[in-house]
């Protein structure tokens, strides 16, 4: 019974290429599957695959036109507009003004004098550094008679001062006393001993008792009881294999009844006293 394919042509080609790549990697470790196939095709006399045809008429790429020259915004010199033989807007100097397009020394002097005349300048040209929103600088004129210095606790109003009979600049407070000499540091005063310890003996050191609740990182060495089903099963299997009785602790030395016992050794000592 025919069934529709589950993969399209692109997926089939991908799987085929992957199978070829993996089969090459299975027996060769050069890492270049395509180069290896081309080398084998050359050695075995297989002609190389034809190259795809090139386009004989490539598309023509048109170049962008050059940008126009920027407009000239330079202002003409004052007095260069002539009406005798000048241009359309009077921008060039005519022949009737006394020149062939060039400025004479007299014209330059007139232009400099006109630019330096304060009457012909605009307010912005007269004060180039002044801004519209600039604040006006505060200027304080120095008075001829200085205001007398007042005491910090004295009122600044003459009516509130009341009994101020002195002249200007007089203070109601008494003059400051001269600075005293630097005081010397007092002698050290030794504190008396405490009445609880008149002899001056050192107090006994504190007693540090051993810790009761000990916490070990590893289990302390000692007898370890055999507990659990798996532990007893391993113990009985070992006893059956070695023909010995079971133990109750892992640290117990196993006893083997079938092994010959060691002969008793008798030691005689001729010493009268035992230490």
UniProtKB/Swiss-Prot annotation:
Organism: Torque teno virus (isolate Human/Finland/Hel32/2002)
Stretch list, region Disordered: 44-103, 116-207
InterPro entries: HEV_TT_vir_Orf2/Gyrovir_Vp2_N (IPR004118)
Pfam families in UniProt: TT_ORF2-like
Compositional bias ranges of the Gly residues kind: 79-98
Biased composition (Basic residues): 129-139
Upper lineage: Viruses, Viruses incertae sedis, Anelloviridae, Alphatorquevirus, Alphatorquevirus homin3
Record's protein name: ORF2/4 protein
Superkingdom in the source lineage: Viruses
Bias (Low complexity) ranges: 170-188
């Amino acid at each position: 019974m025919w069934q529709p394919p589950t993969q399209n042509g692109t997926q089939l080609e991908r799987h085929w290429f992957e199978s070829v790549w993996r089969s090459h990697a299975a027996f060769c470790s050069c890492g270049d599957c395509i180069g290896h196939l081309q080398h084998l095709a050359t050695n075995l006399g297989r002609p190389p695959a034809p190259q795809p045809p090139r386009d004989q008429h490539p598309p023509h790429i048109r170049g962008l036109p050059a940008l126009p020259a920027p407009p000239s915004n330079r202002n003409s010199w004052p007095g260069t507009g002539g009406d005798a033989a000048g241009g359309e807007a009077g921008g060039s100097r005519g022949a009737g003004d006394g020149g062939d397009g060039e400025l004479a020394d007299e014209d330059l002097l007139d232009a400099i004098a006109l630019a330096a005349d304060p009457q012909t300048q605009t307010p912005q040209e007269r004060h180039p550094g002044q801004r519209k929103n600039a604040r006006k600088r505060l200027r304080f004129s120095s008075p001829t008679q200085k205001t007398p210095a007042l005491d910090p606790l004295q009122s600044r109003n003459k009516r509130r001062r009341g009994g101020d009979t002195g002249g200007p600049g007089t203070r109601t407070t008494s003059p400051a006393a001269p600075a005293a000499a630097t005081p010397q540091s007092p002698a050290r005063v030794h504190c008396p001993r405490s009445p609880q310890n008149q002899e001056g003996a050192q107090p006994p050191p504190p007693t540090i008792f051993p810790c009761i609740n000990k916490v070990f990182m590893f289990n302390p060495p000692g007898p370890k009881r055999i507990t659990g089903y798996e532990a007893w099963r391993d113990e009985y299997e070992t006893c059956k294999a070695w023909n010995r009785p079971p133990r109750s602790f892992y640290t117990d030395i196993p006893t083997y009844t079938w092994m010959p016992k060691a002969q008793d050794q008798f030691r005689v000592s001729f010493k009268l006293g035992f230490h």
